[in-house]
Swiss-Prot record:
Annotated compartments: Membrane
Record GO biological process: carbohydrate transport; hexose transmembrane transport; mannitol transmembrane transport; sorbitol transmembrane transport
Disulfide bond entries: none
Coiled-coil ranges from the UniProt annotation: none
Residue spans crossing the bilayer: 53-73, 110-130, 137-157, 168-188, 195-215, 230-250, 334-350, 357-374, 382-402, 425-445, 463-483, 485-505
Presence of the UniProt keyword Glycosyltransferase in the record: no
Region (Disordered): 530-551
Cytoplasmic side: 1-52, 131-136, 189-194, 251-333, 375-381, 446-462, 506-564
One Pfam assignment: Sugar_tr
One example GO MF annotation: mannose transmembrane transporter activity
Keywords: Membrane, Repeat, Sugar transport, Transmembrane, Transmembrane helix, Transport
Lineage: Eukaryota, Fungi, Dikarya, Ascomycota, Saccharomycotina
Family: Belongs to the major facilitator superfamily. Sugar transporter (TC 2.A.1.1) family.
Protein name, per record: Hexose transporter HXT13
Amino acid sequence: MSSAQSSIDSDGDVRDADIHVAPPVEKEWSDGFDDNEVINGDNVEPPKRGLIGYLVIYLLCYPISFGGFLPGWDSGITAGFINMDNFKMNFGSYKHSTGEYYLSNVRMGLLVAMFSIGCAIGGLIFARLADTLGRRLAIVIVVLVYMVGAIIQISSNHKWYQYFVGKIIYGLGAGGCSVLCPMLLSEIAPTDLRGGLVSLYQLNMTFGIFLGYCSVYGTRKYDNTAQWRVPLGLCFLWALIIIIGMLLVPESPRYLIECERHEEARASIAKINKVSPEDPWVLKQADEINAGVLAQRELGEASWKELFSVKTKVLQRLITGILVQTFLQLTGENYFFFYGTTIFKSVGLTDGFETSIVLGTVNFFSTIIAVMVVDKIGRRKCLLFGAAGMMACMVIFASIGVKCLYPHGQDGPSSKGAGNAMIVFTCFYIFCFATTWAPVAYIVVAESFPSKVKSRAMSISTACNWLWQFLIGFFTPFITGSIHFYYGYVFVGCLVAMFLYVFFFLPETIGLSLEEIQLLYEEGIKPWKSASWVPPSRRGISSEESKTEKKDWKKFLKFSKNSD
């Protein structure tokens, strides 16, 4: 067994252990690099960052992450629209017995869910633009599509079907952003900050939800179409922020190297790290990315068929991406965010809009905590603690709703004390969700796949998120109308399944580059042992030597056992 292996076995925190360092290794390729250059990656230190360095990184990444604001804004304003009188008058039905307009369960479900259908399709359609046009231009295109959808919705008048068509197109753009923005963030972010920077996407989603709640709260007393058209009109401001921002942010160095644009790739890495393109750290990063690209090319051209490859572990990662994004919706979060105003009116609150603003505030500030800690705690711990915390809160929320909210039956008055308790545990639930699953699910999907199939795999994973959001958004009015707060127990069962899946199947990737994550999967490390895995480059051995050493060690153990 090598000295590197001994160090791994004897040290608990092996990723930071003082381990054997290999001598410089000559490069075996020359695409875009000086043939005489020697890359001694183990001895190259990352650039030291002061306050200005961190500020530059976050400012460059923020316009990309603002793509998360678009679906968040829709969630916030839609939750208010379904309770607005003028909106119901324009797109609802008239009830002669009461003399009021209302939205049927079908129409309400479609109003909420059509956006999700558009997002699912948009992610699948537009993700491939990232490989042909680049990440930045692809984001600009999907934002323009989003603006077209907003125009169709605003121009709708007493035509609910026109509004729904606009909602789908609106979703196409937002869905494209849900794939492209985390993708670009994960590819330009420094390894030690990647989790927090990808989490900015979710932070902006919560910011969009919060401001959406505030906008409908501000327009709810208008007695004309401005009640809902003003919040929709603000979409153009958010879209312009993203388009202008794309002029300032660097392109993905991985995309640039795949296109043989090596100088631009080094400039991109240098810009995000605020150093010279000739800095040794920049050369090392470009060298590692180039190695990964060349290794992927040796496997042939990318295809949809490759997503089902067992040999390269892509299928395993695709299943993980699909399940993590599915579980994100099965936490039950959109039960509160889409129908929050309606839910809290049912617990006796006269102004559900105000409660929605409170929930939006908790959601936003909790996500700020996630941005700060996700690169310190790790992905697995965040997801495990989050599932356990949400499970406890949902059990209490559902139990109070079932047993205590209506002490004299569903037709009787609600208990104010029980209603207040439900709001408190809803806030605890949102805290657990926003600090864990909300950002980490996007991180896991953004960093799990090799660049060769990344756009395809991310689009499928994210489409599953939107598909489940559609199902929950559409069927929730029917389910709650039938089983009321027993619905919460359905999500409890899902949370139990989530906890078990993460523990047994999801590896830890904190502190690893995207290329090192590829090696983690190739070596077949058990997920519950993955936190102590050390990349070959830090052990002082190559990837091939690592695989050979692992096989030899297994043979040695088998021989020893037979000898006994």
